[in-house]
Curated annotation (Swiss-Prot):
Stored SMART domains: ZnF_C2H2 (SM00355)
Protein name in the entry: Zinc finger protein 142
Record PTM Phosphoserine, positions in chain: 354
Residue spans of biased composition, Pro residues class: 1157-1167, 1829-1843
Keywords from the UniProt entry: DNA-binding, Isopeptide bond, Metal-binding, Nucleus, Phosphoprotein, Repeat, Transcription, Transcription regulation, Ubl conjugation, Zinc, Zinc-finger
Protein's job: May be involved in transcriptional regulation.
Localization terms from the record: Nucleus
Native source species: Mus musculus
Composition bias type Basic and acidic residues, residue spans: 330-340, 837-846
Site of covalent link Glycyl lysine isopeptide (Lys-Gly) (interchain with G-Cter in SUMO2): 794, 1353, 1402, 1747
Segments of skewed composition (Acidic residues): 318-329
Gene name, Swiss-Prot/TrEMBL: Znf142
Record GO cellular component, one term: nucleus
Compositional bias annotation for Polar residues: 1168-1177
GO molecular function: DNA binding; zinc ion binding
Amino acid sequence: MTDPVLASQLANGTGEMDGLCSELLLIPPPLSNHGILGPVQNTCASGELAPLPADPGCLLVEATATEEGPGNMEIIVEAVTGTLSPGAPEETSGVLVKVVEVYFCERCEQSFAEPTLLSVHQCTETHIQAVQDLSSPPCSVELPPSNLALRGPLQDPSLPDSPLPCPVCRQEFVQPQALKSHFKIHRVTPNMFSCPESGCVFSAEDRKGLQNHLRQTHKAVPVPCSFRGCSLLFGSQQGMELHRQAHYPFHCSHCSFMGSNVKLFRQHQRSHGASARGELSAAVQGLPSQELLPAAKLPPGHREPSEEASTPLPGQESAEEEDAEEEESVTQKDSQKVMDKSQGAQQLEGHVGSGTESLFKTHMCPECKRCFKKRTHLVEHLHLHFPDPSLQCPNCQKFFTSKSKLKTHLLRELGEKAHRCPLCHYSAVERNALNRHMASMHEDISNFYSDTYACPVCREEFRLSQALKEHLKSHTAAAAAEPLPLHCFQEGCTYVAPDRKAFLKHLKEIHGVRAVECRHHSCPMLFATAEAMEAHHKSHYAFHCPHCDFACSNKHLFRKHKKQGHPGSEELRCTFCPFATFNPVAYQDHVGKMHAYEKIHQCSECNFATAHKRVLIRHMLLHTGEKPHKCELCDFTCRDVSYLSKHMLTHSNTKDYMCTECGYVTKWKHYLSVHMRKHAGDLRYQCNQCSYRCHRADQLSSHKLRHQGKSLMCEVCAFACKRKYELQKHMASQHHPGTPAPLYPCRYCSYQSRHKQALLSHENCKHTHLREFHCALCDYRTFSNTTLFFHKRKVHGYMPGDQVWQFCNASQELEGARQCLAPPSDSGPSSQLSAQPEREDREHEIVANSNMDQALPETNEEASPKRQDGIEAPQEDDQVDSPSLGEVEEGGCTLHLEALRVELEPETEPLPLEELTETATVEFRPLDPSGPLGTERPGGLEEPALSSFDSIETPALVAEEEPVVEKLASEPPRNPLISEEAPNTFKAALTAETVPLPPFPESESLLKAMRRQDKEQAEALVLEGRVQMVVIQGEGRAFRCPHCPFITRREKALTLHSKSGCQGRREPLLCPECGASFKQQRGLSTHMMKKCPVLLKKNKALPKPVSPTLHPQLPDNQASQDAESRKPPPLPSKVELLLPKDAPSDLPGGPGVEEPLPTPSDFPTSPPENSLPTGTSEKFHFEQGKFHCSSCTFLCSRLSSITSHVTEGCRGGRGQKRKRGRPQTHAVVLPLNNGDSTLLNTGSTESSPSDGDTAVVQKQKGALFSCPTCPFSCQQERTLRTHQTQGCPLKSGDLHCGLCPFTAPAAAALRLHQKRRHPTASPASGPRPLLQCGDCGFTCKQSRCLQQHRRLKHEGVKPHQCPFCDFSTTRRYRLEAHQSRHTGVGRIPCSSCPQTFGTNSKLRLHQLRVHDKTPTHFCPLCDYSGYLRHDITRHVNSCHQGTPSFSCTQCEAQFSSETALKQHALRRHPEPTPPSSGCPVEVTEGPLHCSHCGLLCPSPASLRGHTRKQHPRLECGACQESFPNRPALDEHRRQHHFSHRCQLCSFAARERVGLVKHYLEQHEESSTAPSDGDAGQPSLCCPFCDFACRHQLVLDHHVKGHGGTRLYKCTDCAYSTKNRQKITWHSRIHTGEKPYHCHLCAYACADPSRLKYHMRIHKEERKYLCPECGYKCKWVNQLKYHMTKHTGLKPYQCPECEYCTNRADALRVHRETRHREARAFMCEQCGKAFKTRFLLRTHLRKHSEAKPYVCNVCHRAFRWAAGLRHHALTHTDRHPFFCRLCSYKAKQKFQVVKHVRRHHPDQADPNQGVGKDPTTPTVHLHDVKLEDPSPPAPPAPSTGPEG
């Protein structure tokens, strides 16, 4: 039907439009079908002007025609490239032209209002022009349905991947969201309401006026659109229904269903089934157009399309809440967006006006001046102005502002809905959508919406907004169903009308007034004034603000209103700008957004202010002292999570930051940044008093202390120092405040130190030699970096930070570093690693770091047990040790060495070297001291460092890490121990990376260590005041040993102690002559035969000097012949490395033979008269790795020692050198520059005709080279060059003292020095007289040596005594070898078996006898063979001494005893052992094999002997516990039998009594004397007598003698115990600490017994069996509880009621739930509180989606264990439950209860009618539950006899 009025308007307005904008003439067609959904074709007559093509620069998109007049035509034109201006003003009478921006598609030339719509647009093959206007004024007449026919066949939208067509323009879209976004362009809100009746030109500005016009003029009832947000009126219901379809983007192709909810639309499509899909195309094409209109009769199951068709029912609210956003004022929002775009970006709240930017210090957008509270918000906002290509969707090319939004968008496009509802089939992309679904669909499950909404009529509260709206409809429907009589509201009028028309007529006729109707579409109420109507109209809104008059029906608007806050009574003014407001919410929002950089967060406790709220929260913790963040691996706590994340790196072994220059690796990025300053030369910190510069602030702070005075002073002795750590060390060493600093013993000798760094330096210098330091300017080498620093400062004049020195010597240092980095040219296949000189830092600082040294004394008390354990056992990798000083000092300033204990790790078997070289090609490189040591693979990859040390968390950057370099290849042994351990260390270090980790981290040794720590922690709890220790009198008497401090409560134990264990009753063996004491008879006999001084005096006829030579003397001629024929011994490679590079290699004596040359550092720098004589080198020679003195038997391994010996202390040359033959050694001839040769003779001797004996051939004398500036002289030019290169200590003109190294610039100073220091000095006149022993012929030059000789040889004094037992000896090396039996330190392992030895000689003898089995000495009288000469001597003395009376019948051997003959027969003529009587004869067909090593033995007896000797059963002699290998036994002895150690010295004892005795004898006596230092330490007094002491262990032992004992009481409760471990475990109940963790699950507990009890869960063993029914369980408590089911016993009764139970925990739960009101356990997700933790855990399962209980038959999952047990009965035929009143049976109990209630209602208690078949076995959960498909963890190893 055509509207003539509108057609005439368009016809008349065509010319005006042409004149207005002739360039943009796009003639619209006559709107004959205005208001109808359908495409509009642009047609024009042939005689008229042809329309212009759609220019991309200017495209007419929308045209809205109104019916008021020809001049009110609004044209909306969107211009992309330019702006359009209207024509002449006179031609545009009343015409409005609005120019906005447009986005168009270049392919189909379709335009869009927003770029997002263009991004989701998909072009079709045919050009489709958009509809000009969708919401034009509708008409009330019957509309032809042909205009609504679908254009073309529709694709099946029921398929998941089928496109969705737009119902207006038929454009297809893949995604529903794209269709909905596109559908918005068809909606426009009308500005004028026109009359829908034909021929009527009435229009009104408001809807009410049109409604009154229709009723009064046309007598028609207006039908409003039932869609929310649409204000249009229609003349008939059919027109309204037809229009309402235009509001829904989704239309069903099978029926008239439509909607805007994607989920409901998909569900409706699935309801048609798959059969309708195949007939879709034909059905749509042949579908009559009337099907789209509402029919009178609909098919069954379909309801009339109404508001309910698109609005979900209560409980069906959309997850995305699309209906609430689109159906409620959606057209108003869209039009507002268009208006915003047309008018430009408006200035929103919080934006900064131009010119006022300086007032605000905040996160401000530079483009739109918008402000944000956080920088992250600004960064996300900037993506709007500057799109990030990485945040662009690859499918629709749409840009996003964050990765999370892009991820959500991609998930929506892919249709992946990861969040699923556990109660229904709903799924969503986002978690919030699922929460909204749970709140709307499952009200009682989720508490996502915490708001409540009250009904404005009856004040009833609702949790869901939709429920409130439905409730409001009931009030409206009730008012409409029962209309109340209408009373006249005029004063004095009592008229009452039951009819609405009569009431209106009465008001109009009688009072002349007009009633105001309620604006609500379904409310019939009338009011006298508009104000009363408006007040009533608010009652139709669902949401009312309680603080103001605001009311609305949109929940989101209501929430937005509440967030905006309400004005208060006080005006709030901003302190940074003129802003003022009464609204506190607006004020906080303004300050947070506009002044984010200002310090707006003030501390209420102090004056602290900050710009960040997180910083304020962290600052407030300073006042409270709380540290909420705690490390799970140690006791570290901090205030901020960022500190914790940095601290966690200390527990990690990964070092991700590596320096590319030197290989330095670290865990912290900042450390690497600071380290890189060295390579860049960035010495940013400079001293203001000198030229010192460095790259670290802490180094500068330490340096500045040099220029300051000693500001710190000791209060006790007035000791002054500069650094705090120096004062702390002084107090610890001198005055012992509290616990003294622990002693760090050396692992290889008896050296001890209270400073760990000194110990590490000692071990490196004396024993390990793992790191060697080289001077880059000369050939100086040392094993101490401090000594290297002193060398550079003394010889080369180096000072840290001296720029002049660095500039002059930089090139030399670099050259020396390159030479050191170059690999050795003569490296053989063994690839020996030579130590590399360390590149010294230019800012090298000798002063130790004050921060670390300051921290060390604080941790001494805590770390002392760990350090002691670290001495005894290897540290685990995952344990954090004490601060690694190697990591603290950087660049080689300090050295931290940890010796690897390979023999203490039996689980890591080292690979053989052959397998190691086959499996991985390892390239040995020169060591870099500044980087880690690693192995390089062929691909260039670098393996992790073999040895590194973890650092602990420090508050500031105090140091950088420095990895420790281990020696991988064995060098010529400086120390035999190191040469033996180096290969094993290397193998173990490499295989530690390849061998898989043990299956569980909680080893038995770790648990024992934690138990010991728990015992020691009890003392700390006493000091903290959390535990009170009291002494109580025990029951019974105590028995004390009269000879020692042993005390016991059992008389039998005292008797046993007196017989065997008392050390005081053992009487020593005394020598009758001199009184020396011995423990064994053999020692006494040896002493009386050879060493007793009294017997030696009696038996001495003439004084004969005792020759200390080990070998027998040879005749002189034989000695000379041997000397002439002896070949020069080969030199070790260690001596070869000492040669300088310019030394010639073609020396006499054969290739490869090089003699060690004494360097100037080995000789004392003295004047010529005291320097080394010319013939010094003749007096010693080098043989078999040792330097031998040619005049006596002295030998050593160092060149400096032999030089000092032959120069000063050799006494053999004076009286014995002519009686002793000396071997001949070759001389080394070095060519000089002048062509001569200087013969350096190292002890060569020849027979001279002028001397009968061996004489010394005079050395060929050459020219002496002298230093021009000092008295130094030498015979070789190279030595002089080295002396000058190192730096002469004297300057030209300095004078040198001849008696000491003193130098002076003037002669007067030298004379004064000699007068003071050497007043009686006179030139030496001949040798000093020798001192001679009066008891023997011993002579020496020093009185100290003579005194020591008398004490050792004649007085029997043994100065070296073992601290662990009574062993004493005269030799220190014997003591060290003996102590290794106790400590295990220094033991030399055998490479073929796990045995260890204290000396190399015993190791060699062991290898000869056990492994090689090749005897070297033979008895000449029989077949006996041995491995030492002493074996043959002992055999001859015992078996062949005297007259041989026993002869062998099978050979000619004769013996002096029958026992020797039997041994010979068993050894030489073995016979098979006859079988014993009564035993079957063993038939042995061939040799017997050893099960351990596979050795073939001829007889069982030999096999038993072999097993007893070669594979002994290692058993502890104290506790008879057996071990698989020697290291395990040593570890056991160390841990258990020497576990009592003195805290003041290195003493250790097996039993506590020995330690008590040691304290009484050594420390208590010395501490009883009063002193100033001990005045502050109170004595410990006995509560029963006057005894006092200073050590708690002594007091405990004394109190035990009174029969008393200690009792520990908890201060928080009434718990008390005598056990220290138990009080520690109990205290954790109050603190919540749970250090014991299960390695198979997340279980943690406070004591190890609970952990052991818990570990049975992971085992399948069920060792407790019920004798009645065969029930098996894992715990005895389970069995006890089960037995009560058979006995019916319920011993636990509630004291407050009659409740009884058979379980104590059930009674506890009953009392907590029934008789307590406190609900201490709260759910963090929903806020519900519970009385017990079990109920809370049960409740938490509701929030989780996990269903851990899976049936092993059908794989059905259950959330509860009971559900699985009940379900398991469905797979069986058993019916265990039956009715006692009839024959009914069931599988579950509740079924029988339900049966009794239904069929036996007379039964009072239905549970009494339920019975259970006792023959039916109980369904156990482990029998029906499906186990985890992952491989089970290996069972934990047995921990002892308990299992």
